[in-house]
């Protein structure tokens, strides 16, 4: 069993790595903490999340750029360029798959078993939903469906616990609603369901705004603003009665997430 000092050292290294923007090393340091089979503190959870979000975020951005260039070259009929771009895109997809697989293992084998119910449980099931959603962004066919199904189940589990145990203004519950609604919009191509979920979360939080603690006020109101921004963006995609629904399933960035 690692000593408290070793645990503190891993956390300190993670903080240093974050400051130096060396996110792969930040992730490794926090994986060392997770592997201790201990319940993570709020600070440790956030360090782990920030590390992985930056590691995966860089690849997601690369994938979007490459996909856009690939489409433009295809439209021009530049087959040689398309072949090169596709090879490069597949390399990025392989990296994305490995990162997502890595965090799933950490969540399933260490984090969820070591966590109490309530806030930590919501946090990690939300995280699981997020990383399966990231897989569904670039997978196709059966692999995409499988990733989407896993994402849906994780978000639903997180939502059930959040609604039972967290206030409607809690930043983790709001962040979950934000990301789950993005899942409906981007992955399931359902702007109606996305808007319903986002609006419900926003309205419930507004009605309880006076109960918001000072420490979480900034985080909660920021996420509420993102929910409102997405609602504004998505409402235009909801078809009028009798009008054919037109949603671009390959949209590069359908809304903000937490």
UniProtKB/Swiss-Prot annotation:
Basic and acidic residues bias (residue ranges): 244-258
Pfam hit, one: 14-3-3
Organism for this UniProt entry: Glycine max (Soybean)
GO biological process, one term: signal transduction
SUPFAM superfamilies: 14-3-3 protein
Gene Ontology cellular component list: cytoplasm
Similarity annotation: Belongs to the 14-3-3 family.
Taxonomic lineage from the root: Eukaryota, Viridiplantae, Streptophyta, Embryophyta, Tracheophyta
PANTHER family hit by this protein: 14-3-3 PROTEIN
Region feature Disordered, mapped onto this chain: 237-258
The name this protein goes by in its record: 14-3-3-like protein C
